[in-house]
Amino acid sequence: MKAQVLSTLGPVEDGRLTLVDRPVPVPAAGEILVRVAACGVCHTELDEIEGRLAPRLPIVPGHQIVGRVERLGSGATRFQTGDRVGIAWINWACGTCDACRAGAENLCPAARWTGKDVDGGYAEYAVVPEAFAYPIPARFADAEAAPLLCAGVIGYRALRLSNLSDGQTLALYGFGASAHIVIQVVRSRYPRTRIVVFTRSEEHRELARRLGAHWTGSAADAPPGPVHRAIDFTPIGSTIRDALSRLAPGGRLVVNAIRKRDPVPELDYAAHLWHEKEVKSTANVTRQDAEEFLPLAADIPIVPEVRTFRLEDANDALVLLKQGRIQGAPVLTMT
């Protein structure tokens, strides 16, 4: 099979992925082999390749995988050959630690992550424990479904963590793959909420307005009225300070990032945290997040904005993603 392999860390501009031929993996007991149709390209891959979230090496990246079951490992009974499934960031959790027993498998210290600890979806085939695969709603094409598995699921988790009430003002910082899905959830499920979007790109602002943003601007602009909840999707450390400075008393900021590309600047307690302002981070996802979000996405229905690339062009997709030159979500397709 063809696969893009990361062997050394460094800037994505250097074309760190190498296209190779590899044997098709064999599913172990309880696993399924998936013929990959599409795999989303995520900011987490930038963090892995550039060393901010160092993966096992060599590794096949990619954790937003859509494909069809090709083969069942012994004892695997949840799916049938030919079923369409998705594979997300969480690949396995122990099920016995304090976090897992509390329903927080995303915090399991022994968890394995797709495309970081085990080979992912920048390849023609991938294997996964059947308990960590998900049925894909029929209404989505393969490339549309791929970003739902991370950008959508982690965005859904961030929105839940924001504790948004209908009618409050929600600020979204950055408007890429995750934010463009979250805004559609908010417009559907929180119809009285006012949405303001901060992004540097005029093309991204235009997309935000098309999807229902009430106001758009850059980090230097001031939106009308107070901001009660905010979600930071950016890789920029200073966005945390900017967002906290705009929060109303009692407001909450959710930082939807595994790593920041640059440091968070020093905060001033009175300006940024006083008046019971809160900061929460998102940390990975659970199976429950995906199992709740995918049917919700079909019901709304979410319309993912995607730009497709061939598997051979994965390095180009990563560079464009880093440069902020992709509207919506980049997706690799295998055909």
Sequence positions of predicted segments:
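C-terminal hydrophobic helical "lid"/dimerization subdomain
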Residues: 3, 287-335
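Glycine-rich beta-strand-centered segment in the early N-terminal region that forms part
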Residues: 25-39, 49-98, 132, 137-139
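Cysteine-cluster motifs in flexible loop/terminal segments that predominantly coordinate metals
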Residues: 42, 90-134
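Mid-domain Rossmann-like dinucleotide-binding core that forms the NAD(H)/NADP(H) cofactor-binding site
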Residues: 85, 131, 138-221
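A short acidic, Gly/Pro-enriched loop at the edge of an enzyme's catalytic core
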Residues: 222-230
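Glycine-rich phosphate-binding loop and adjacent beta-alpha segment
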Residues: 237-303, 334-335
